[in-house]
Amino acid sequence: MTFNHIDIDLQELNRIQDGQIRFYVTPEGNRYPSITTVTSHKNRQIFVDWRKRVGEEFANRKTNRSTKRGTATHLLIEHHLKNMPIPKADPLPTYLFKQAIPTLNRINNIHVLEGTLYSDQLCLAGQVDCIAEFDGELAVIDFKTAEKEKPEDWIEHYFVQCMAYGMMYFERTGHAIKKIVILMTCENGDVVVYEKRNKLDYMKLLKEYITDYLDFHNGK
């Protein structure tokens, strides 16, 4: 399959790392935190408790493996969607990518692929995996890897993050997304698609996430 790409003029943003927080600098010189920083903050205590429960050594090993798996699989997906030759990779990401191909081929008319976005209204920025049509409808699409399918209540922050990208994209271009899509390719052989159309619900949750983040950093 050959993927069609829509020519959208978006300016790439510079990134700045300040301690644990990643910022993006807009063309106007504003410095906005990444949406990933905000959504991660919301779940910070869950991960602190998990690390205490399993131990630092195991937690670091698990986290590093997950990061490596995700980065390598993302690269293969990106090449596929760019109609480029697929590079060689380790067996696991190759397997995760190949089993996802039939689902990836439901994507077309790609607006953004690994592109940076920002919102002056939200005072947020970030790098989105993909904005494209999925089954013929414009969507923010996030690619995830996992050992097995995750319950939806574990991944609320994925949907919130995607909604933020949708709002950023509308502010930048005037194009409104129809839905959020999480495409999760799993080590157990499952390829799971989570689709959400209740955008207003995730807009409200995003506001809560932002408030929680700002209250923490403002000492409230």
Where are these regions (language model features)?
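Mg2+/Mn2+-dependent nuclease catalytic core
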Residues: 114-219
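Metal-dependent nuclease catalytic cores that hydrolyze phosphodiester bonds in DNA/RNA
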Residues: 1-125
